[in-house]
Amino acid sequence: MERQEESLSARPALETEGLRFLHTTVGSLLATYGWYIVFSCILLYVVFQKLSARLRALRQRQLDRAAAAVEPDVVVKRQEALAAARLKMQEELNAQVEKHKEKLKQLEEEKRRQKIEMWDSMQEGKSYKGNAKKPQEEDSPGPSTSSVLKRKSDRKPLRGGGYNPLSGEGGGACSWRPGRRGPSSGGUG
């Protein structure tokens, strides 16, 4: 039993000496060359990233070349599909342009018609703004709103014809009077 105890106590002493030796050598190496080791690791990482990206691109090019060489029919079909899609998009765009041109033409025709109506109403001596509402009323099918509203000539005026707000006549509790002349204190000097 004593032998087993001696061998167990001897083993940890050897292991601890080995760990101490390893610790001192690694510690001294890091203390001496630590920054060099850190920078070299960073440099190796960057170089590895660059090379791996280039290798991936090179492999992809080789695969694309192999696929194109093996299946030229697929490439031709892709190009035809792409051309058909472009043609379809161009046709849709042309249709939209035609619709827009037609809409602009209709708006221009409407403006021209309104200008002609304004000119005619001005020649007759009527207000052109009142006529701008007539085309909208004509377009709406339904009961005429003009029959519901009284005409301007049929209405009773709100005030008498001789009403002048600056004269002070015409009724009401408030009337305008000109201010007095002269200083407000009542005397000169």
From Swiss-Prot:
<keyword id="KW-0963">Cytoplasm</keyword>
<dbReference type="GO" id="GO:0071222">
    <property type="term" value="P:cellular response to lipopolysaccharide"/>
</dbReference>
<dbReference type="GO" id="GO:0005789">
    <property type="term" value="C:endoplasmic reticulum membrane"/>
</dbReference>
<dbReference type="GO" id="GO:0080164">
    <property type="term" value="P:regulation of nitric oxide metabolic process"/>
</dbReference>
<dbReference type="GO" id="GO:0002865">
    <property type="term" value="P:negative regulation of acute inflammatory response to antigenic stimulus"/>
</dbReference>
<dbReference type="GO" id="GO:0005886">
    <property type="term" value="C:plasma membrane"/>
</dbReference>
<dbReference type="Pfam" id="PF06936">
    <property type="entry name" value="Selenoprotein_S"/>
</dbReference>
<comment type="subunit">
    <text>Interacts with DERL1 and (via VIM motif) with VCP, suggesting that it forms a membrane complex with DERL1 that serves as a receptor for VCP. Also interacts with DERL2, DERL3 and SELENOK. The SELENOK-SELENOS complex interacts with VCP. Interacts with CCDC47.</text>
</comment>
<dbReference type="GO" id="GO:0032869">
    <property type="term" value="P:cellular response to insulin stimulus"/>
</dbReference>
<dbReference type="GO" id="GO:0034599">
    <property type="term" value="P:cellular response to oxidative stress"/>
</dbReference>
<keyword id="KW-0597">Phosphoprotein</keyword>
<dbReference type="GO" id="GO:1902236">
    <property type="term" value="P:negative regulation of endoplasmic reticulum stress-induced intrinsic apoptotic signaling pathway"/>
</dbReference>
<keyword id="KW-0256">Endoplasmic reticulum</keyword>
<keyword id="KW-0832">Ubl conjugation</keyword>
<dbReference type="GO" id="GO:0019899">
    <property type="term" value="F:enzyme binding"/>
</dbReference>
<dbReference type="GO" id="GO:0050728">
    <property type="term" value="P:negative regulation of inflammatory response"/>
</dbReference>
<keyword id="KW-0812">Transmembrane</keyword>
<dbReference type="GO" id="GO:0051117">
    <property type="term" value="F:ATPase binding"/>
</dbReference>
<keyword id="KW-1133">Transmembrane helix</keyword>
<dbReference type="GO" id="GO:0036502">
    <property type="term" value="C:Derlin-1-VIMP complex"/>
</dbReference>
<feature type="compositionally biased region" description="Gly residues">
    <location>
        <begin position="159"/>
        <end position="173"/>
    </location>
</feature>
<feature type="modified residue" description="Phosphoserine">
    <location>
        <position position="140"/>
    </location>
</feature>
<feature type="region of interest" description="Disordered">
    <location>
        <begin position="115"/>
        <end position="189"/>
    </location>
</feature>
<comment type="similarity">
    <text>Belongs to the selenoprotein S family.</text>
</comment>
<dbReference type="GO" id="GO:0045719">
    <property type="term" value="P:negative regulation of glycogen biosynthetic process"/>
</dbReference>
<dbReference type="GO" id="GO:2000110">
    <property type="term" value="P:negative regulation of macrophage apoptotic process"/>
</dbReference>
<dbReference type="GO" id="GO:0051775">
    <property type="term" value="P:response to redox state"/>
</dbReference>
<dbReference type="GO" id="GO:0045454">
    <property type="term" value="P:cell redox homeostasis"/>
</dbReference>
<dbReference type="GO" id="GO:1990381">
    <property type="term" value="F:ubiquitin-specific protease binding"/>
</dbReference>
<dbReference type="GO" id="GO:0009749">
    <property type="term" value="P:response to glucose"/>
</dbReference>
<dbReference type="GO" id="GO:0032715">
    <property type="term" value="P:negative regulation of interleukin-6 production"/>
</dbReference>
<dbReference type="GO" id="GO:0005783">
    <property type="term" value="C:endoplasmic reticulum"/>
</dbReference>
<dbReference type="GO" id="GO:0036513">
    <property type="term" value="C:Derlin-1 retrotranslocation complex"/>
</dbReference>
<dbReference type="GO" id="GO:0034361">
    <property type="term" value="C:very-low-density lipoprotein particle"/>
</dbReference>
<protein>
    <recommendedName>
        <fullName>Selenoprotein S</fullName>
    </recommendedName>
</protein>
<feature type="transmembrane region" description="Helical">
    <location>
        <begin position="28"/>
        <end position="48"/>
    </location>
</feature>
<dbReference type="GO" id="GO:0005881">
    <property type="term" value="C:cytoplasmic microtubule"/>
</dbReference>
<keyword id="KW-0712">Selenocysteine</keyword>
<dbReference type="GO" id="GO:0030970">
    <property type="term" value="P:retrograde protein transport, ER to cytosol"/>
</dbReference>
<dbReference type="GO" id="GO:0006111">
    <property type="term" value="P:regulation of gluconeogenesis"/>
</dbReference>
<dbReference type="GO" id="GO:0038023">
    <property type="term" value="F:signaling receptor activity"/>
</dbReference>
<dbReference type="GO" id="GO:0045184">
    <property type="term" value="P:establishment of protein localization"/>
</dbReference>
